[in-house]
Amino acid sequence: MSERKLFTSESVSEGHPDKIADQISDAILDAILAKDPEAHVAAETAVYTGSVHVFGEISTNAYVDINRVVRDTIAEIGYTNTEYGFSAETVGVHPSLVEQSPDIAQGVNEALEVRGNADQDPLDLIGAGDQGLMFGFAVDETEELMPLPIALSHKLVRRLAELRKSEEISYLRPDAKSQVTVEYDENDRPVRVDTVVISTQHDPEATNEQIHQDVIKKVIKEVIPSSYLDDKTKFFINPTGRFVIGGPQGDSGLTGRKIIVDTYGGYSRHGGGAFSGKDATKVDRSASYAARYIAKNIVAADLAKKAEVQLAYAIGVAQPVSVRIDTFGTGTVAESQLEKAARQIFDLRPAGIIQMLDLKRPIYRQTSAYGHMGRTDIDLPWERLDKVDALKEAVK
């Protein structure tokens, strides 16, 4: 009998408390970068009933109305009704942003490689904003080269948001979660969806029967290809029986609490660093994007069916301390060849990544819900497949 395995990933909507925090942090980052592309930003957000606290470190000469950015972001998400216990115009906003530590700044502004060196490469100037390890991943399970469980989970909560904002389902409220369990065959290929879990906040008048019917018909069956669904697929829709109190009224939220949702749904390893609120000198963010860029181009070049890239850095040092690529036995060339090619083709110094992916632009708010990787609805530079030919040539 062939061995089949299950794998599960989850996603959350833009109205989930942790995602509200992520979106506020990235909206602040974008507002600052729009006025000062050289700014250093580390903006953290905490949300709870009736309150938003924004704190962290920034280095910029630009003025940004933090209060307005916070309120506009909350309104765009859909928290405009005081009945939700959290509303854009009535929430208390408490900013507390201070200047970046000069001890950190000296290592970021002048990397170890150029200190005391008159013959400087401009891309050696910026040192990594912290030590750490970052992972990027790609797999040929979907068109966007993402694991199927997280890809479907994102699409389910995005569909819920579309139906809410268009008022096609008028009783929906902003907070929601999804979870998809996929069955894989003995060759590690997805064959069917075993279980779908969706919890969506709703008005008190909505009945469980109506929610169940609408979610299956207008969300699940609109998003998940019928070839993955069968009579054994299990659906759990609002399994607690009621989800009226939600968002920050139901749970507090913090920036950086959904790092697995932001990446690969647990299918690949994670270095532990969050993305939102951080400018691109923070390698937690920029190197994770670079690692995805490498992995996706490797898989798109048919050099592997599955690729995981690890990068690691020392604070204040420009060059990565290590580059590792794992193809899990699916590669068509040696992993050492891929590692050598990656170092040749992709500039993995922080300034090199920033230049390669044009990361000084205000592009981050759009990434802060529904995943930073595998997005097909927006143009993200780390999702481009413009290094395929160079990789093929490098490993000949």
Curated annotation (Swiss-Prot):
Catalyzes the formation of S-adenosylmethionine (AdoMet) from methionine and ATP. The overall synthetic reaction is composed of two sequential steps, AdoMet formation and the subsequent tripolyphosphate hydrolysis which occurs prior to release of AdoMet from the enzyme. Binds 2 divalent ions per subunit. Binds 1 potassium ion per subunit. The keyword Nucleotide-binding applies. Pathway: Amino-acid biosynthesis; S-adenosyl-L-methionine biosynthesis; S-adenosyl-L-methionine from L-methionine: step 1/1. It comes from Streptococcus pneumoniae (strain JJA). It is an enzyme of class 2 (transferase). L-methionine binds at E57, Q100, D251, K282. Its cofactor is Mg(2+); K(+). GO terms for biological process: one-carbon metabolic process; S-adenosylmethionine biosynthetic process. This is S-adenosylmethionine synthase. Its main location: cytoplasm. Mg(2+) binds at D18. CDD domains: S-AdoMet_synt (cd18079). GO terms for cellular component: cytoplasm. One of its GO terms (molecular function) is magnesium ion binding. Its EC number is 2.5.1.6.
